[in-house]
Amino acid sequence: MTICDTVDQYTIMSGDRLKIKDLLCNRLTECGWRNEVRLLCRNILLEKSANNSVSVDQLISEVTPKARTLVPDAVKKELLMKIRTILAETDEDN
């Protein structure tokens, strides 16, 4: 089991995963990431629709790498700090 799997499993069991997910969703909305990804999807659909229809799987495979690069470093750092805080609190409790 990797460290990511262990952290993921712990956050699910402790109930903190929902808090982390909510924080991520809020930050992505605040920084405009959701709108950027929406526009990215729209542009891909417009570009591809001229040729033929685009499946959801094709859209996801094309958008995902680009969307990941659009996540601001500040959001990534804040999430990492939150996860570290949760894990540190766990160590203190044990």
Swiss-Prot record:
InterPro entries: TF_ENY2 (IPR018783), TF_EnY2_sf (IPR038212). The keyword ATP-binding does not apply. Component of the nuclear pore complex (NPC)-associated AMEX complex (anchoring and mRNA export complex), composed of at least e(y)2 and xmas-2. Component of the SAGA transcription coactivator-HAT complexes, at least composed of Ada2b, e(y)2, Pcaf/Gcn5, Taf10 and Nipped-A/Trrap. Within the SAGA complex, e(y)2, Sgf11, and not/nonstop form an additional subcomplex of SAGA called the DUB module (deubiquitination module). Component of the THO complex, composed of at least e(y)2, HPR1, THO2, THOC5, THOC6 and THOC7. Interacts with e(y)1. Interacts with su(Hw) (via zinc fingers). The gene is e(y)2. This is Enhancer of yellow 2 transcription factor. GO terms for cellular component: cytoplasm; DUBm complex; nuclear pore; nucleoplasm; SAGA complex; transcription export complex 2. It comes from Drosophila grimshawi. Involved in mRNA export coupled transcription activation by association with both the AMEX and the SAGA complexes. The SAGA complex is a multiprotein complex that activates transcription by remodeling chromatin and mediating histone acetylation and deubiquitination. Within the SAGA complex, participates in a subcomplex that specifically deubiquitinates histone H2B. The SAGA complex is recruited to specific gene promoters by activators, where it is required for transcription. Required for nuclear receptor-mediated transactivation. GO terms for molecular function: chromatin insulator sequence binding; transcription coactivator activity. The keyword Transit peptide does not apply. It comes from the Eukaryota. Belongs to the ENY2 family. Keywords: Activator, Chromatin regulator, Cytoplasm, mRNA transport, Nucleus, Protein transport, Transcription, Transcription regulation, Translocation, Transport. GO terms for biological process: chromatin organization; mRNA export from nucleus; positive regulation of transcription by RNA polymerase II; protein transport; transcription elongation by RNA polymerase II. Disulfide bonds: none annotated. It is found in: Nucleus, Nucleoplasm; Cytoplasm.
